[in-house]
Structure formats: C-alpha cells, structure tokens
Amino acid sequence: YGVALLSRQKPIFVQKGFPTDSDDAQRRFIHARYDFNGKYIDVLNGYFPQGENRKHETKFPMKRKFYADLTDYILQLKAENRSMILMGDMNIAPLDFDIGISEDSVKRWLKNGTCSFLPEEREWYQALLATDLHDTYRALYADGQALSWFDYRSKGFDDEPKRGLRIDHILMTPDLADKL
C-alpha cells in the first residue's frame, strides 16, 4: 500500500502494521526506531485510508478504525516516553485554510459526505494532536497555505492560485521541536 521508510541509518526496531492487526489486514503503517547516539526516535509512517465517503460501507469504517488504532498505538508509545515523528498521507485537511478548493466545492463535498475535511475526520486528527503531537508545518507557518494534494484530473496544480488540499502531514513530539 505504498508505505516505506528509507534511512541512512539502520533501525533497531521495525513494526509493520499495528500489533493488533489481523493476518489479512492492509499494512498501511510502518514504525521504525532509531538510535541517534543514545537518543531513541520512533518514526511512524502511514498511508492512511482515504475513506471515500461517510456512506461507504467499508472504506469509511476502515479509515475510522485506522485512526482509532493509531491513536491507541501512539498513546502506548507515549506511556513509554518515546520521542516520535508521525508522518504520511493522512487524507485529512485539518483546518479551513488547508482547503484550497472553491467554496462551492467545499459545500458540495460536505453535503455529499466526501472525505478529507468532514467534521468527524477533523476530530480524529485532533485526537492525534491531543496525544501531544504537534503539526510541524503549522509550527513553522501558522497562517500559511501550502497544499500537498491536487486532483490531476482537473489540473488544480496548474492554476493560480493552486487548487488542492493539505492532507500530508508531519507531526512530532515537543522534545524534537528544536530539530525543525
């Protein structure tokens, strides 16, 4: 499902998927631990389910479960006082200025239950932040608008201003903030 970690340094631990995953689960998540001169840093990378639409019988519940499993997993790591970086295609635009599509499109997406900035999705993202993870982009650019996804069919990347969403994120624990 497109999840990988590349590093010059060999990890001391690798977990593919969540420990609670069933044998037939999609492995959309990888966790590696690195030793940097006695400082352990856990790097978690995911290709989060897109969810399609809140009415979809399998994709939306899969996204909800993924976020619940991830939040539980992070809380377990936090209980061990782990330094963490969580990154990936999270498929959620958490704030209004992370949305770079027309107001009419926003209204249509919300009315139709299209995923990316539904209220419940934003709650799932906020649950990650509530574990004391911080949005690195927002730490550097509090009011900035940078988009990471563009619909290739409508060529939103060709327009000025560009049309898309910020759905790719890097979150980290506060003890790593000086590394930004």
Q: Which ranges hold each PLM region?
A:
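Metal-dependent phosphoesterases centered on the DNase I-like endonuclease/exonuclease/phosphatase
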Residues: F66-R163, I167
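Long, contiguous hydrophobic alpha-helical segments, chiefly transmembrane helices and signal peptides
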Residues: V3, F29, G46-P49, K63-F66, ...
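Short, solvent-exposed loop/turn segments at secondary-structure junctions
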Residues: P11, F48-N53, N91-A93, Y141-D143, ...
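Surface-exposed cleft-lining segments at the edges of enzyme active sites
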Residues: P19-T20, F48-Y67, R108-G113
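Structured beta-strand-rich core segments of catalytic domains in phosphoester-bond hydrolases
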Residues: Y1-K55
